[in-house]
């Protein structure tokens, strides 16, 4: 079973990732002439995060057999890496200029001359960074669970021998 704090983080992250997926999906769908690998990777990162963190993580909360700390930690770490890389790639692509500067918009591969696309790219960068920080917190929760319960959620320490004596002790 996952801690309730971990599930709350995953619920907030679900909202951020859905918004980021909508924004980046809109950017990918309205690309006019240029190829945008940054946007395509951001769509992948948001979809991968939704699938592995939100859906699998919440499923692991309700079905304890799927709450393997090693799997959750690997997913959280991969999601951290993917969302950080996607947010940084978009941020480097838009180069943080004003979306009202037409000279900048015309020369930018992501904005493609549209201030609306520029604002969508800036917003998707922000939401991907929000998700990145939540993935860091989720990875910390998973690492704590991994250190306490072992790779597959079972403690490596045997249960203490207390209670009623056995027949051989009588």
UniProtKB/Swiss-Prot annotation:
Domain of life, source organism: Eukaryota
GO BP, sorted A to Z: actin cytoskeleton organization; actin filament organization; eisosome assembly; positive regulation of sphingolipid biosynthetic process; protein localization to plasma membrane; protein transport
Protein's membrane topology: Multi-pass membrane protein
Compartments reported by the entry: Cell membrane
InterPro entries: Marvel, NCE102-like
Record GO cellular component, one term: eisosome
Disruption phenotype annotation: Leads to decreased virulence and forms abnormal hyphae in mice. Shows defects in forming hyphae and invading low concentrations of agar but can invade well in higher agar concentrations.
Pfam family, one: MARVEL
Transferase among keywords: no
Main location: membrane
Keyword S-adenosyl-L-methionine: no
TM region(s), chain numbering: 12-32, 39-61, 77-97, 126-146
Cytoplasmic side: 1-11, 62-76, 147-170
Spans within the Extracellular topological domain: 33-38, 98-125
MARVEL domain sequence ranges: 6-141
Keywords for this protein: Cell membrane, Membrane, Protein transport, Transmembrane, Transmembrane helix, Transport, Virulence
Family: Belongs to the NCE102 family.
Function: Involved in membrane organization. Involved in a novel pathway of export of proteins that lack a cleavable signal sequence. Non-classical export pathway also functions as an alternative clearance/detoxification pathway to eliminate damaged material, when the basic repair pathway is not sufficient. Regulates actin organization and subsequent morphogenesis and pathogenesis.
Cited PANTHER family: NON-CLASSICAL EXPORT PROTEIN 2-RELATED
Name used for this protein in its record: Non-classical export protein 102
Species for this entry: Candida albicans (strain SC5314 / ATCC MYA-2876) (Yeast)
Lineage summary: Eukaryota, Fungi, Dikarya, Ascomycota, Saccharomycotina
Gene: NCE102
């Amino acid at each position: 079973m996952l801690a309730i704090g971990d599930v709350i983080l995953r619920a907030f992250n679900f909202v951020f990732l859905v918004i980021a997926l909508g924004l980046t999906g809109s950017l990918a769908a309205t690309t006019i002439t240029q190829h945008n690998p940054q946007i395509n990777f951001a769509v992948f990162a948001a979809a991968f995060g939704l699938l592995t963190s939100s859906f699998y993580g919440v499923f692991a909360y309700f079905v304890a057999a799927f709450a393997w700390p090693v799997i959750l930690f690997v997913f959280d770490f991969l999601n951290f890496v993917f969302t950080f890389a996607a947010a940084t790639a978009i941020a480097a692509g838009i180069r943080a200029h004003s979306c009202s500067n037409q000279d900048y918009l015309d020369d930018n591969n992501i904005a493609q001359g549209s201030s609306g696309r520029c604002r969508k790219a800036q917003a998707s960068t922000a939401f991907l960074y929000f998700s990145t920080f939540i993935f860091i917190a989720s990875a910390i929760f998973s690492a704590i669970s991994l250190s306490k319960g072992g790779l597959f959620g079972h403690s490596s320490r045997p249960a203490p021998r207390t209670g009623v004596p056995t027949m051989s002790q009588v």
